[in-house]
């Protein structure tokens, strides 16, 4: 059946499961809404959620927001996430971060994204707090994206950096690129490919400068700093050890990395030391 085969008169709020036999569509649930809003009568059917399934996310366990409410005044509060309104656990499943730790958050391509284990999860396009599909019958270009990185080793994604070709996904020992041949990340077109196997400190987020980003890699005795430039989807990235000329000069106690893209420099420092390590570069004209 299809929704068009359902009766035009029924009890208000009656829910049925529609299994399509004429077209290639997933089963879905429909709720009847009478014209008068109660009782039995004529009305229309609208797609709804399956009876008895969870309606969505628990805001108390999700990332919160810090809102500027005035001069030097901020409010830290839960976010109101959009509930699951249609489908069930098969046709409109929970995002893969449910029941797991979220290790990072970012905005990209008009979507809010989270990193959890080896998964990258991105919200509805233009609807940052909606991680569910709008319909269970088909996939739309604006629907959420939920993909995992294929690797032979366990990994935890902890950072994401925008790139001309897509988004670089970073774990402690591997880097990946999520991209789309069409140029726009969508549930159908998005792909993840491996880029490199550099060790990156998971507690110091990389910073962007122009078309490159910089990251810290530590040994027990000192820290190394690298620049990372993506050269294409199918070509190795250009990675340079910019601290090689001062090997073992930067201590392993470094806790933060910051950048000034406009002034073409990065700085490193430690919360336990008053020394700043400064690196500036000049672009050839």
Residue ranges: model-predicted function:
Residues 77-100, 137-153, 249:
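A short helix->beta-strand "capping" segment at the edge of beta-propeller domains
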Residues 93-118, 154-161:
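Beta-strand-rich domains and repeat architectures in extracellular enzymes and scaffolds
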Residues 17, 22, 31, 36, ...:
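Context-gated lysine
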Residues 72-87, 115-141, 178-183:
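Beta-propeller domains
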Residues 46, 53-68, 111-135, 216, ...:
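Eukaryotic alpha-helical scaffold "rod" segments
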Residues 119, 126, 148-285:
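Beta-sheet-dominated scaffold domains
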Residues 1-96:
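Long, charge-dense tracts
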């Amino acid at each position: 059946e299809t929704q068009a085969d359902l009766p035009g008169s029924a009890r208000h709020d009656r829910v049925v499961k529609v299994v399509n036999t004429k077209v290639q569509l997933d089963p879905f649930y429909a709720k009847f809404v009478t014209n008068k809003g109660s009782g039995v009568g004529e009305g229309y059917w609208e797609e709804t959620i399956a009876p008895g399934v969870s309606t969505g996310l628990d805001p108390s366990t999700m990332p919160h927001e810090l809102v500027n409410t005035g001069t030097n005044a901020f409010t830290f509060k839960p976010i109101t996430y959009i509930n699951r309104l249609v489908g069930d656990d098969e046709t409109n499943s929970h995002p893969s971060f449910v029941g797991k730790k979220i290790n990072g958050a970012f905005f990209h391509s008009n979507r809010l994204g989270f990193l959890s284990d080896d998964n990258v999860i991105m919200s509805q396009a233009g609807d940052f707090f909606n991680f569910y599909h709008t319909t269970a019958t088909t996939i739309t270009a604006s629907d959420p994206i939920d993909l995992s990185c294929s690797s032979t080793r366990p990994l935890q994604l902890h950072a994401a950096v925008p790139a001309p070709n897509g988004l670089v996904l970073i774990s402690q020992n591997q880097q990946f690129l999520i991209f789309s041949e069409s140029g726009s990340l969508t549930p159908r077109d998005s792909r993840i490919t491996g880029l490199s196997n550099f060790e990156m400190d998971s507690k110091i987020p990389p910073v962007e400068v122009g078309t490159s980003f910089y990251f810290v890699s530590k040994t027990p005795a000192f820290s190394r700093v690298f620049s990372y430039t993506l050269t294409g989807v199918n070509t190795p990235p250009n990675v340079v050890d910019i601290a090689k000329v001062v090997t073992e000069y930067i201590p392993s106690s470094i806790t933060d990395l910051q950048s000034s893209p406009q002034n073409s420099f990065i700085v490193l420092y430690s919360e336990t030391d008053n020394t700043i390590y400064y690196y500036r570069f000049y672009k050839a004209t």
